[in-house]
């Protein structure tokens, strides 16, 4: 993860801290897929076109929307995720083709090549926690190394919801 961040930082100009985090998140969501419902996005599907509605960012965004729809999340949550990722994914500068390839396609390919195997063999809470911790460190305000992300397995979170008698759909319980 550190190598991926450094590689993107050094070789992909014009991407800020938030952009790198959003691109990793978007790439992971787009490549997860849902068996029998949403096919995972493959690198070859990104064509680096500058045609309106068919840029690499548009393709990734459509795949994310299909994934979120099948996950049956509340509409407000889907809208929040899309709004957060959309500005980065549809920015003209990262969708502009240079030497036949957009910056977005290059970054997407790096992310899939570096992280894809972990998701293909089965996403684990431990790996996801490490991913969140690493990406949190990419952000400029995260100087405090004592902060850490802890992911609770869903069965434990469900038990805690029942014990605490809170709304399980609260954003506090998202991860």
Identify the residue ranges that each predicted region occupies:
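Accessory nucleic-acid engagement/destabilization modules that flank
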Residues: 1-49
